[in-house]
């Protein structure tokens, strides 16, 4: 249990509100020449104003101002309020005045007098009314002003509140003060707090007789003399009260802080705010005391718990929190939250490559979004489905809607004005044209449209989309063989980092795969076998799976197991043609099959395949792949004793071959072997 007691949500005023009201009273009364700075009121009142729920799934974090610029909401704890006051140059005087007022309030009657005095002497309807009060020595505020709006709201809440609500605020105020009196700040100031002086100031303008005041004090004394162990009807309300708006602001900020802190960690930097962990711990201590009844009315708290559990790798807790969010939102007033919750669940499953569960959630979310005619969320679901298929293309056939249909739907979404929708549409069109081996001109056209729409917007507003653009540029130019261009994009991409936890975890696995390929080059077969065995126990995405398949094939070729390697190659080529349309990996496995035949001294059997592939890539317009196949053809010719034809073939195409640094080493090896063979022929003659 938190030392601040259970957290309770209320529509009535809170001890935190009462502190602000006291500061307004002191500011208007000009006690001891006090003038509370506007910045202090802004800092304290802003979190209590209505704010929209901020869901990290639906909102773009980059559109928010940086958390390092906007100060965090003040927690409903007196220690935090006093520390905010002490940041000002006259903070000591203001803090002492606040503590004096709080100590002077000795019952509901004191709160009543404070509220009446504020309404009577500090609040006016408009500036004209203010000018009419020429005899007033107090500062005054209009109802429409920033302070006036807050004051009017609090007065209205207090007036419509019943006796039980007022008793609750009094009881919670005692706990509010008691907790503070166990802090070092209280020990620092307690000897300078002047209670009687504040009492006199508060009562100075009250129209209450001496006899009435004595009667009030008598009954207060009489009540205090009762049995100290007696129960009150609201004993369960001891703890910390908070308004719905205030709690919303705190949870919103905590989510933004979590995302910012995670991004710092993923970039290898330390969090700049030294108070992040302390503040986060305090917020979670308070939220953990929230009753289940209140939590069900405030499901966003479960998103916060979900994010925190993900950070701590507590996946079961994360899943439970997400299910709670799903359950409580689905029973709320807003129908659209039902499919938003399902979408959240789908993205969670896909993050851990639990594809079957993700697909079920995606389809259910799509169905309900259509029933509710929520086009904005439906667009978002479509984008997430394509993102899922991009990572797991082998599951594309499991959806009732095809990628082509989704792209057409997004491109024709005339009822939305969000440029990101159209950027994503052309992004997926580019992806589809790449994997389906479209002509180079068509791929280039789609990529150019994707770039034009994405760069028209500020890239920082959707950095993930901008990163996708850069990664597609890298892939496009690399497959065409122009590494000088792809390197430019790759260097830029390496300097950026996504805040996605899935990307972070995947990067670790991808690094292991790179180490395994390096071990294969160094003939460290034991390490390669260890990585291959380890990969069997992991949930991997498509790229990781296909890379490991490629590693297995190259490993088998390296150890001379040509029969098994050829069987696996044929299986993988079939998968790339039927289950997944992946021309890039199909080409790599086709090249490996040619290598196996060459190593088996039956390279001539690969001749029909080489000729067919050359014709195919000439039609598509991929010069790099044509050159790679040309060199394989030369190896076959050399193997069957047609070295002169091979040399002639290289010589005729040398200018094209030298355009691609990727194949220069192999070209040099072939020319060197041809030169050695010519020398041998000369010696024989």
Swiss-Prot record:
InterPro entries: Apc5, Apc5_dom. Present with 259 molecules/cell in log phase SD medium. It comes from the Eukaryota. It comes from Saccharomyces cerevisiae (strain ATCC 204508 / S288c) (Baker's yeast). Pfam families: ANAPC5 (PF12862). Belongs to the APC5 family. The APC/C is composed of at least 13 subunits that stay tightly associated throughout the cell cycle: APC1, APC2, APC4, APC5, APC9, APC11, CDC16, CDC23, CDC26, CDC27, DOC1, MND2 and SWM1. APC5 directly interacts with MND2 and SWM1. Keywords: Cell cycle, Cell division, Mitosis, Nucleus, Ubl conjugation pathway. Transmembrane segments: none annotated. It is found in: Nucleus. This is Anaphase-promoting complex subunit 5. Disulfide bonds: none annotated. Its main location: nucleus. One of its GO terms (biological process) is protein K11-linked ubiquitination. The gene is APC5. Pathway: Protein modification; protein ubiquitination. Component of the anaphase promoting complex/cyclosome (APC/C), a cell cycle-regulated E3 ubiquitin-protein ligase complex that controls progression through mitosis and the G1 phase of the cell cycle. The APC/C is thought to confer substrate specificity and, in the presence of ubiquitin-conjugating E2 enzymes, it catalyzes the formation of protein-ubiquitin conjugates that are subsequently degraded by the 26S proteasome. One of its GO terms (cellular component) is nucleus.
